[in-house]
A protein has these predicted regions:
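N-terminal regions that are enriched for targeting/export leaders
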Residues: 1-39, 43, 331-351
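Long, contiguous internal "core" modules enriched in hydrophobic/ aromatic residues
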Residues: 1-16, 95-263, 280, 348
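Transmembrane-helix bundle segments that line or gate the permeation/cavity pathway
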Residues: 25, 32-129, 145
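Hydrophobic cores of alpha-helical transmembrane segments in multi-pass inner/ER membrane proteins
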Residues: 37-48, 75-81, 106-118, 179-194, ...
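Extracellular/periplasmic helix-loop-helix junctions in multi-pass membrane proteins
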Residues: 165-169, 241, 279-284, 305-319
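Membrane-interface transmembrane-helix boundary segments in multi-pass integral membrane proteins
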Residues: 173-177, 243-264, 307-338
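Hydrophobic, well-ordered secondary-structure elements that form the walls
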Residues: 227, 271, 302, 343
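Central hydrophobic cores of alpha-helical transmembrane segments
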Residues: 285-296
Length: 351
């Protein structure tokens, strides 16, 4: 199934590049930013668990590290995106596609994060104990990785997403994007855990208490993501900054406004209602529903960041759908079969 989705994605990207290059470029960039961000955030989540000395996580640390198996593919996709974008950017208004030097810098950032992630994964695979030699190396690498992620993805957000609308400036935009990545990684982990809980072989790996812990984290990031979103809008209003309203007006009026409301409902409203009570965090079906809703909302979020600036106007059609399916298929294939150095949570059991 993943291979079929990848084939559809290639058809959509190549066909879209020939028929509607703006739409193909928009779809490729939005899906890249989301899935590369989730893959990196999975490793970051494992690093946070290691730095804090968490003992409740069970196999979640290994699951997060396995997300990192998509990072080499993401780097390759970025290289293709940079080359194709430079060709297709002729169809985009001048100044709305990053310059070559900016793309080189972004590629260097992705390469650095990939190197740190693989080194951290290797250190944990050699010895997960903090007091051993490899564990001490991981204690050094983990904080460096966290700092590099915060700075690196802030730059990537500024260059690849906010830079598409030069009239809009937000110093909070980078934090909003890298927190959104963590929100998506938690949703993907929660979805995986919920699916494991419904399988006889995986029920021991995802007991109700572990689902409850994941649900609480997902609920907290639901509130944080919404807070950061509102925090970027509020200063424009109370600071009376009319020159920055164009970015918001484009996304709050037809034809984009309906998608913005759907994004808020899927990213805040539905998860808030489902995860507010104890039952929603412990029942696999409810937790999985909230997780899928969050992932869909983040896909809409990245699309709304990119599409109004590059593709012009909706409706979204077969190009966007096929590229999204292809990207999801590539992510699933890498995570499911990728050569991660971390133990396989499905075969090594609970930590």
């Amino acid at each position: 199934m993943a291979v079929l989705c990848i084939a559809l994605g290639i058809v959509g990207l190549v066909g879209g590049g020939l028929i509607a290059p703006r739409r193909a470029l928009s779809a490729a960039l939005s899906n890249f930013s989301l899935l590369a961000g989730i893959a990196q955030a999975g490793v970051i989540f494992a690093a946070i668990l290691f730095v804090t000395g968490a003992r409740w996580d069970g196999p979640l640390r290994q699951m997060g590290l396995r997300f990192g198996t998509f990072l080499p593919a993401a780097l390759g996709l970025f290289a293709l995106l940079a080359l194709a974008g430079s060709r297709w950017a002729g169809a985009v208004e001048h100044g709305r596609w990053p310059a070559a030097g900016v793309l080189v810098r972004d590629g260097a950032i992705l390469t650095l994060l990939l190197g740190l992630s693989r080194s951290f994964d290797r250190s944990l695979a050699q010895s997960p104990h903090r007091g051993s030699g490899s564990g001490r190396r991981a204690r050094v690498l983990a904080p460096l990785l966290l700092i590099a992620y915060a700075y690196g993805w802030s730059w990537l957000a500024f260059d690849l997403l906010m830079g598409l609308a030069p009239e809009f400036v937000s110093t909070l935009f980078g934090a909003f994007v890298f927190i959104g990545n963590l929100y998506g990684a938690l949703a993907a982990l929660a979805l995986t855990a919920a699916l494991l809980a419904r399988a006889p072989a995986g029920a021991a790996l995802a007991p109700p208490q572990r689902l409850h812990d994941l649900g609480k984290l997902l609920f907290a990031f639901c509130l944080l993501w919404t807070y950061l979103l509102f925090s970027q809008i509020l200063p424009i209003w109370y600071g009376n900054l009319p020159h920055e309203t164009g970015y918001l007006v484009d996304r709050m009026t037809a034809p984009w406004s309906v998608w913005g409301w759907i994004m808020m409902l899927a990213g805040f409203g539905l998860p808030f209602v489902l995860l507010l009570g104890r039952a929603g965090k412990r029942r696999p079906a409810l937790l999985a529903s909230a997780s899928v809703s969050v992932l869909f909302a983040l896909w809409l979020e990245r699309s709304l960041m990119v599409a109004p600036a590059l593709s012009g106007a909706p409706p979204w059609g077969w190009i966007e759908l096929s590229v999204a399916l292809g990207s999801a298929g590539a992510f699933t294939l890498c995570v499911g079969r990728g050569p991660s150095r971390s133990p396989d949570p499905l075969t090594d059991g609970p930590m």
